[in-house]
Structures are given as C-alpha cells and as structure tokens.
Curated annotation (Swiss-Prot):
GO terms for molecular function: protoheme IX farnesyltransferase activity. Its EC number is 2.5.1.141. It is an enzyme of class 2 (transferase). It catalyses: heme b + (2E,6E)-farnesyl diphosphate + H2O = Fe(II)-heme o + diphosphate. Belongs to the UbiA prenyltransferase family. Protoheme IX farnesyltransferase subfamily. It is a multi-pass membrane protein. InterPro entries: Protohaem_IX_farnesylTrfase, UbiA_prenyltransferase, UbiA_prenylTrfase_CS, UbiA_sf. Pathway: Porphyrin-containing compound metabolism; heme O biosynthesis; heme O from protoheme: step 1/1. The keyword Ribosomal protein does not apply. This is Protoheme IX farnesyltransferase. It comes from Afipia carboxidovorans (strain ATCC 49405 / DSM 1227 / KCTC 32145 / OM5) (Oligotropha carboxidovorans). It is found in: Cell inner membrane.
Length: 313
C-alpha cells in the first residue's frame, strides 16, 4: 500500500440543499402575504398624512417581508403538523426541499431586516408594531395557542389584523380610531373564515391533533360560533358609517356585504349533515374572502372620490 493510500481520508459527500427560489417563496405564504399587503395598503392610503412615495413603498415592502418572515417561522415550527395534513403536506419542509434550520434562519433574517429597515427609514412606532406582529404570530400563536386551545384562531387573529395599523403608524407616526376599526374588522372576520375552513377540513386537523374548534367542541357548536361571530362582525363593520369615520359608499357596501355574510353564515348553521353542510362551509369560506376584499377596497376609492371632489369644488 502506498503512502498516499495509507494517508487518504474519505470525506462524506457534500450535502447541497435542493431548495429553489420557489421553495423559499412558498415559505413566505404568498397568499397570506397578499392579504397582508392589501390591508396594509388600505391603512396607508386612508391615513391623513401621505408619505413620500419611496417611504410608502418601503413601508409596504417591510410589512410584506415581515409577514413573510412570520410565515416562514410558522412553517419551520409546524413542519411536523404540516407533514400530517393533506392541505399542507406539499410545503417545502415536509417535502424535504428546505431543512428546518434553513427555514428558521431565513425567517429570522427577514424579520430582523424588515423591522430594522422600517424603524430606521420610516419610524420606530411602525417598526415596533411590526416586530410585535411577527412575535405574536410566530411565537404566541404558532408556538403556544395553535396546539393548546380551541380559541387559537380567535386570539391569534390579532396578528393578521395588525398590518393596516402598522401602515397607518408608518404614515402618521401615531394611532387613531380608523386603523383600530380596520383591526377589529379583520380580527372579528378571522374566526368565521377559518372555522368554515376547519369544518370541511376537520379530519386533517384531527389527524394532526390540532385543537381546532370543530375537533374539540364539535361541528354544531362551531356552526353556532360562526353565526354569532358573523353577527358581531357585520355590526362592527357597519358602525363606522353612522359614527362618521367612513363615508356613505363604505356604509352601503358594508350593509350589502354584511347581508351576504349573514346569509352564508346562516346556511352553515342550518345545513349540518352531508354534502350540503360541506358545500355551505366552503361557500362561506370563499365569500368571506370577497367580503373582506370589497369592504376594504371601497375605502381607497372613497378617499380618491373625496380628493377629486375637493379639486373640483
């Protein structure tokens, strides 16, 4: 045996991550991020102080990246649950495309970047609110509430309701009733929306041992809670009109959309078995997305209409 052969050492093969750009984008939860960006834009546009376009774009980018960071940390911590659920089994970590340490590092890096950038370039109230939003979703909801209480969606919904508040703070450096109203609408919208999903995905949640309300309290109790929360949501969403915070266009839209939400929620409560029950839950889930989108979309249009009227008159 030669000296070279005697001293040769076999090294383990270098493990190269299979993750592509699309896998890291998936970690950001793009569909959730789109809702975050949309509601934040509304909060920014209706604020009485208008940021310089560069700062406005920076604010929205930071809020989007912060929301994505929270999503990545959520996927990192919940990879064991995701692997057990049909709806989430194809996410990057369960599929082995991204490792848990990579996802955690990715999420933490984005979180620090988004908060620091928003704080330094815009203002620290917005930065602090964004940091709280990420912490609440990634730690309070993901690591605690999701696995321990059937009220996980109710309390955890606060994180998803904060983006318009962060955006308003970015524009004004302060808080006011208007962003709090937007917060309350999203907060009250979250339980009917996600419990409708949980009704027709209850087997998935039960398999993963996630204590969603239909799994813990049963489908009938969930249907009642959906109806009650919808009644409160519709009422709270209409009130800003008579209170003078939003205009007639918003008010009429909220009344019309509220009637639709109540109708779909009542159908969920009424149909309790068979395909009709699943169909009603799916219909509410889909309509609730349209409800929130149209309700928020009318606000920038109202602001634009007032601006045009002011120029004319």
């Amino acid at each position: 045996m030669s000296v070279i052969e005697q001293n040769s050492v076999e090294y383990p093969p270098l493990i190269v991550s299979e993750a592509g750009v699309s896998d890291y984008i998936a970690l950001l939860k793009p569909r959730v991020m789109s809702l975050v960006v949309f509601t934040a834009l509304v909060g920014l546009v209706i604020a009485p102080v208008h940021l310089h376009p560069v700062l406005a774009a920076t604010s929205i980018l930071c809020i989007a990246v912060g929301g994505g960071a929270a999503g990545a940390l959520n996927m990192w911590y919940e990879s064991d649950i995701d692997a057990l659920m049909t709806r989430t089994a194809n996410r990057p970590i369960p599929r082995g495309r991204v490792s848990s340490p990579e996802a955690a590092a990715f999420g933490i890096t984005l979180a620090i970047f988004s908060v620091a950038t928003l704080g330094v370039l815009v203002n620290w109230l917005a930065g602090a609110l964004l940091a709280f939003t990420i912490f609440f979703y990634a730690v309070v909801y993901t690591m605690w509430l999701k696995r321990w209480t059937a009220q996980n969606i109710v309390i955890g919904g606060a994180a998803g309701a904060l983006p318009p508040v962060v955006a308003w703070a970015a524009a004004t450096g302060s808080l006011a009733p208007q962003p709090i109203i937007l917060f309350l609408i999203i907060f009250l919208w979250t339980p009917p929306h996600f419990w409708a999903l949980a009704l027709f995905r209850s087997d998935d949640y039960a398999r993963a041992k996630v204590p969603m309300l239909p799994v813990v309290a049963g489908p009938d109790a969930t249907r009642l809670q959906i109806l009650l929360y919808t009644i409160v949501l519709v009422t709270v969403a209409i009130l800003p009109w008579p209170l003078g915070y939003f205009g007639a266009a918003y008010g009429l839209t909220s009344v019309a959309l509220g009637a639709g939400m109540l109708w779909f929620a009542f159908n969920v409560y009424r149909y309790r078995t068979g395909t009709q029950a699943n169909r009603a839950a799916r219909a509410l889930f889909k309509f609730s997305l349209l409800y929130l989108f149209l309700l928020f979309a009318v606000l920038p249009l109202e602001v634009a209409a007032h601006a045009v009227a002011a120029m004319i008159w």
